[in-house]
Amino acid sequence: MAKLIVSDVDVKDKKVLVRVDFNVPIKDGVIGDDNRIVAALPTIKYIIENGGKAILLSHLGRIKSDEDKKSLSLAPVAKRLGELLEKPVTFVPSNEGKEVEDAINNMKDGDVVVLENTRFQDIDNDFGKRESKNDPKLGEYWASLGDVFVNDAFGTAHRSHASNVGIATAMKAAGKPVAAGFLLEKEIKFLGNAVANPVHPFVTILGGAKVSDKIGVITNLIPKADHIIIGGGMAYTFLKAQGHNIGKSLVEDDKVEFAKELLEKAGDKLVLPIDHVAATEFNNDAASEVVGQDIPDNEMGLDIGPKTIELFKKTLEGAKTVVWNGPMGVFEMPNFAKGTLEVGRALADLPDATTIVGGGDSTAAAKQLGIAPKLTHISTGGGASLEYLEGKELPGIACVSDK
């Protein structure tokens, strides 16, 4: 069933609550990467250009003490949003009470207000984690502030919080519309369709350190994907399951048996490294060498080797849908980043393919290579992307009204 989108709703003269994902890196009040703010602009602009009042809610970081509040205020985010929109944005240093209500009542059509970090509610008022535990009273309070609710925060769609599910539940009970923003719509369209209804050949590239993080994804995708490329630290658990020597490489010994089962279930769908860049130490400056599929006892694999790069490129040839999540090696060390970067290049060069990238290192590689414009979609969710790829229903999407 298709979801209600913000463009399906009349926002003129309406107070529109928007759950955005402004969880950006901030150090000493300076925003390190404003991509998540930029990603929310289409939804915000649509609301204000069509005569609505945009009231924005977001979390930022994890709040465990009053000390955290000093460094995790959304004030710098509101300032940056104003610069990007080229118009004044009102920041309210609270998210409940008279100050909030007065600011909203003073809004004119086309105005934008940013409320303080929703997770401040996790330590305020001695009520326990009101935001993170989805206190229904908090959801009802926030819902009372608006006429329409738009969820545009895919990054928290796998969480059931007061600021997404809580507001949506209360809005629906009051007969008010609950819609997806354009960013959430894009995630549903590309990531959701890639899993539910991919154009074949469908290839998934999975990397990162742990098999345990990707078990659900692999299990869900075995029947759907034509090939599942496995790189990064998680590959060594599979190689050990095949009987290869992996030296001092990262391995999850308690997952070796499970890896064996997956190998049997997947048959030749799983594509594993056939050579490695190995070193004796986990260090960017460590002397390294290319070794075959078996790694010497005193060395550890830190990146895929040149033959593996060619094998993975060949596996990608002709693919029509590709989902990439996770690096092929220790991407944060420049000397062991080549495998990840080469896979990114191969992805960008695929003709007529839907290419979807998720996960921090894969996204960083895409940006480093400057290939982002050539990719169909870069997902804004970490854990949410993985759970979506596992085929799970995400609370932040399920709570949006159907058309």
From Swiss-Prot:
Enzyme Commission number: 2.7.2.3
Entry's transmembrane regions: none
Binding of substrate, residues: 21-23, 36, 59-62, 119, 159
Acyltransferase keyword on record: no
GO molecular function, one term: ATP binding
One Pfam family here: PGK
Keyword Cytoplasm applies: yes
One of the GO BP terms on file: gluconeogenesis
Cited PANTHER family: PHOSPHOGLYCERATE KINASE, PHOSPHOGLYCERATE KINASE 1, CHLOROPLASTIC-RELATED
Name of the protein: Phosphoglycerate kinase
Taxonomic lineage of the native organism: Bacteria, Bacillati, Bacillota, Bacilli, Lactobacillales
